[in-house]
Amino acid sequence: MIKLLIGTLTILCSLNCKAQNFTVAEQALIVSGDTSKLLRLIPLAEPEGKKYLRKISLDITCNDPLLPLLKERMYKAVTDSNHKGVGIAAPQVGINRNLIWVKRYDKPNMPFEFFINPKIIWHSKLLRKGFEGDLSFKENWGDVVRSHSILISYTDISGVQHIEMLEDFTAVIFQHETDHLFGILLT
């Protein structure tokens, strides 16, 4: 286990070296419209949907000055009463960066948590099958097989790196949202 952790930290350090700030186009989208409101979810059915939802996302530096604003606007999108979800990935609002919100059913009061550059570094062989939907194409639901447990790494908004084990429905949500970062939809 110690070798796995050391290897993981080495990989994290090398990946963070490739992280970049938001592009000019991404910056424009983040500050577009009323910045006190949510960012619009991009449906897969729209031409924009395929552009963002089928593309592999890039790592982001955690010190980009627009990151807190994007974080808040994504949170408003996933918790909006018109389309409440249990998770959201940045590509769903038109930003191809490795950023997700996940509802933590494994914590008291089930808070949402923001993950920067999330990675799944191990997954259990024990699988579970469950019914999943998606904010980007609400009309499609289906059975999806996911790992019951996963070991993840991520950076928080303060720039602190974490390694954590997730299980059950929280692990399912995390896997679903990280799939979005690879352009994968309802696997």
Regions found by a protein language model. Name each.
Residues 1-21:
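Bacterial Sec-dependent N-terminal signal peptides
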Residues 17-187:
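Positively charged
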